[in-house]
UniProtKB/Swiss-Prot annotation:
Its EC number is 2.5.1.3. The gene is thiE. This is Thiamine-phosphate synthase. 4-amino-2-methyl-5-(diphosphooxymethyl)pyrimidine binds at Q38, Y39, R40, D41, K42, N70, T109, K138. Mg(2+) binds at D71, D90. Belongs to the thiamine-phosphate synthase family. The lineage of its organism: Bacteria, Pseudomonadati, Pseudomonadota, Alphaproteobacteria, Hyphomicrobiales. Pathway: Cofactor biosynthesis; thiamine diphosphate biosynthesis; thiamine phosphate from 4-amino-2-methyl-5-diphosphomethylpyrimidine and 4-methyl-5-(2-phosphoethyl)-thiazole: step 1/1. 2-[(2R,5Z)-2-carboxy-4-methylthiazol-5(2H)-ylidene]ethyl phosphate binds at T135, V136, S137, G171, I191, S192. It holds the Pfam family TMP-TENI. It catalyses: 2-[(2R,5Z)-2-carboxy-4-methylthiazol-5(2H)-ylidene]ethyl phosphate + 4-amino-2-methyl-5-(diphosphooxymethyl)pyrimidine + 2 H(+) = thiamine phosphate + CO2 + diphosphate; 2-(2-carboxy-4-methylthiazol-5-yl)ethyl phosphate + 4-amino-2-methyl-5-(diphosphooxymethyl)pyrimidine + 2 H(+) = thiamine phosphate + CO2 + diphosphate; 4-methyl-5-(2-phosphooxyethyl)-thiazole + 4-amino-2-methyl-5-(diphosphooxymethyl)pyrimidine + H(+) = thiamine phosphate + diphosphate. GO terms for cellular component: cytoplasm. GO terms for molecular function: magnesium ion binding; thiamine-phosphate diphosphorylase activity.
């Protein structure tokens, strides 16, 4: 398992192109506290995704912040990204590991018990549970799991993979960070609350500070 700092996953979605060029958004987050970046595009062509991923990777070069690609192992491989984030309907993590290699970061989405059980046997480096709350960033057919559901799924993951970082995603704003971290999250994934904020740099920094404070408060 590769060591992944999952405290703040800034998720750069293609729909944010109306805010600013995606590489600019990624760099702003990388310079102000994001510990991992995820590029997501549910509708773009493969060529567009590879070009965008390469541009983001170039923009954040030298920051030390890794870039993972949502869903697409082929795009991760072609763009030279640091890894991939996979959902239940995507390529399985074992196959992705064979293609991308041992040093690649592989993350998994966990929405329910079946996903958690699947993750237990997969060569993944982190898992992200969600959606935890309602979100405006994505049409989600699944009901939010809430804090209680998050706690249950996290416990299953930690039982089987005690060293795996577990994050939370969906509807997480600054006010919800303390509760999510207190419930056991090792970090959070954020889209709108960072990238549609009036000041992206400040929003990223504020999230990072809130996460670090909540993690410190959780220590025994």
């Amino acid at each position: 398992m590769n060591k992944v700092d999952y405290r703040l996953n800034a998720l750069v979605d293609a729909s944010l192109a109306d805010v600013a060029p995606l590489p600019e958004l990624a760099l702003a987050a990388a310079l102000n506290g994001a510990t991992i970046l995820q590029y997501r595009d549910k509708h773009g062509s493969t060529r567009e995704m590879i070009e965008n991923a390469r541009a983001i990777r170039e923009a954040i070069g030298g920051t030390g912040v890794p870039l993972v690609i949502n869903d697409r192992v082929d795009v991760a491989l072609a763009s030279g990204a640091d890894g991939v984030h996979l959902g239940a309907d995507d390529m399985d993590a074992k196959t992705a590991r064979r293609i991308l290699g041992e040093k690649a970061i592989i993350g998994l989405t966990v929405k329910n018990r079946a996903d958690a059980e699947r993750a237990a046997s997969m060569p993944a480096d982190y898992a992200c549970i969600g959606g935890v709350f309602e979100t405006v960033s994505k049409v989600n057919p699944d009901k939010p799991v809430g804090i209680e559901g998050f706690t249950t799924l996290r416990a299953l993951l930690k039982e089987w993979q005690p060293d795996m970082p577990v994050g939370a995603i969906a509807g997480i704003d600054l006010d919800r960070v303390p509760a999510v971290i207190a419930a056991g999250a090792d970090g959070v994934a954020v889209i709108s609350a960072i990238f549609r904020a009036a000041n992206i740099a400040s929003a990223t920094s504020d999230f990072r500070s809130a996460i670090d404070a909540a993690l410190k408060a959780r220590q025994p």
